[in-house]
Design a protein with these regions (language model features):
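Hydrophobic/aromatic beta-strand patches that form the interior of the parallel beta-sheet core
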Residues: 14, 36, 53-55, 73, ...
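Catalytic binding pocket for nucleotide-activated donors in carbohydrate/polymer assembly enzymes
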Residues: 26-33, 60-128
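Short acidic alpha-helix that forms the nucleotide-activated donor recognition element
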Residues: 42-50
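Acidic donor-binding loop of glycosyltransferase active sites
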Residues: 49-59
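C-terminal alpha-helical cap of glycosyltransferases
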Residues: 133-152
Length: 152
């Protein structure tokens, strides 16, 4: 609520909580036209097509978002605690394809200034994905046909 209010009328926020989160997010009555809780939506990837900026914490959605060239902010207010309790496969700050913020004020400032460190997205994509050329479906179809021809 505070973030939406601080950013002003030009922003709408879609909330999609992790499926294991059972807490219901309380949205102020006067912000319900700008904060939309789609936590019950089945398919996260569909939401990415209407996403101008992804604000996340430690979610693997960054892989899908990077393929769509979506700028990202990482709201890691509890990073030290998260590392202590769960940790990561990679060094978090080296791994993420965007800017890390630790407070709501830092998040608001980054959004207002469009300071997302978006240049990290391209490097991230090429580190984790091969053949990013829009022809993956064709390669899969060719492989299936090839395998079917081997059986005949």
């Amino acid at each position: 609520n505070e973030i939406c209010t601080a950013l002003g009328e030009n922003y709408a926020i879609i909330i999609k909580l992790h499926p294991f989160c059972k807490e219901k997010y309380e949205i102020d009555e006067n912000l319900r036209n700008r904060i939309i809780d789609l936590s019950e939506a089945d398919e996260l990837n569909d939401l990415l097509f209407v996403t101008d900026l992804l604000i996340t914490d430690y979610s693997s959605v960054v892989f899908e978002a990077s393929l769509l060239d979506i700028p990202m902010l990482f709201y890691a207010f509890d990073l030290d605690e998260y590392i202590e309790n769960r940790d990561f496969y990679y060094d978090f700050k080296e791994f993420i394809p965007g800017k890390t913020v630790a407070t709501q004020d830092e998040l608001i400032t980054a959004v207002r200034n469009k300071d997302f460190e978006s240049e990290k997205v391209e490097n991230f994509k090429h580190k984790f994905f091969d053949d990013i050329d829009g022809k993956s479906s064709q390669r899969v179809a060719d492989k299936i046909i090839s395998l079917l021809n081997l059986e005949n």
